[in-house]
């Protein structure tokens, strides 16, 4: 784990082991029984998963001293984004991937659906 001190690595490993143990202690529900029983088991399992998720976030913030949430990415305004399909877009799944094309003027096509 580049750029970290050894003590921080140990804290991170301890936190990950604890979170892994929490998730392993809540296996998926048994698919047997009546529909209502299965539904109740799934509902209780999902609630436990939500609790484990919130506990995991608290563990990470305590051990690492920071939030588990990523830093928000700054995006340009939606009205300035457009798809540029001038170059042979349909031949490969990787073509057209990259930085978005930005228009100076907002296109009128996007504004036609908004009624005031």
Swiss-Prot record:
Question: Could you tell me where the Basic residues compositional bias lies?
Answer: 36-47
The record gives the effect of mutating residue 39 to A/K as:
Decreases methylation by host PRMT6
Its GO CC terms are: host cell cytoplasm; host cell nucleolus
**What results from changing residue 38 to A/K?**
Decreases methylation by host PRMT6
InterPro entries, alphabetized: REV_protein
Q: Where is this region: Disordered?
A: 23-49
Q: How is it modified after translation?
A: Asymmetrically arginine dimethylated at one site by host PRMT6. Methylation impairs the RNA-binding activity and export of viral RNA from the nucleus to the cytoplasm. The methylation site is still unclear and either occurs at Arg-35, Arg-38 or Arg-39. Asymmetrically arginine dimethylated at one site by host PRMT6. Methylation impairs the RNA-binding activity and export of viral RNA from the nucleus to the cytoplasm.
UniProt GO MF annotations: DNA-binding transcription factor activity; RNA binding
- Assembly and oligomerization: Homomultimer; when bound to the RRE. Multimeric assembly is essential for activity and may involve XPO1. Binds to human KPNB1, XPO1, TNPO1, RANBP5 and IPO7. Interacts with the viral Integrase. Interacts with human KHDRBS1. Interacts with human NAP1; this interaction decreases Rev multimerization and stimulates its activity. Interacts with human DEAD-box helicases DDX3 and DDX24; these interactions may serve for viral RNA export to the cytoplasm and packaging, respectively.
Q: What is known of its domains?
A: The RNA-binding motif binds to the RRE, a 240 bp stem-and-loop structure present in incompletely spliced viral pre-mRNAs. This region also contains the NLS which mediates nuclear localization via KPNB1 binding and, when the N-terminal sequence is present, nucleolar targeting. These overlapping functions prevent Rev bound to RRE from undesirable return to the nucleus. When Rev binds the RRE, the NLS becomes masked while the NES remains accessible. The leucine-rich NES mediates binding to human XPO1.
Recorded protein name is Protein Rev
């Amino acid at each position: 784990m580049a750029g970290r001190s050894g003590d921080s690595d140990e804290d991170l490993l301890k936190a990950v082991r604890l979170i892994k143990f929490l998730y392993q202690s809540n296996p998926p529900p048994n698919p047997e029984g009546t529909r209502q029983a299965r539904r109740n088991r799934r509902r209780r399992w999902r609630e436990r998963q939500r609790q484990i998720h919130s506990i995991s976030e608290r563990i990470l913030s305590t051990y690492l001293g920071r939030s588990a949430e990523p830093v928000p990415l700054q995006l340009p305004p939606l009205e300035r984004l457009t798809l540029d399909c001038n170059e042979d877009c349909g031949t490969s799944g990787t073509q057209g991937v990259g930085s978005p094309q930005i228009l100076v003027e907002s296109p009128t096509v996007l504004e036609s659906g908004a009624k005031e």
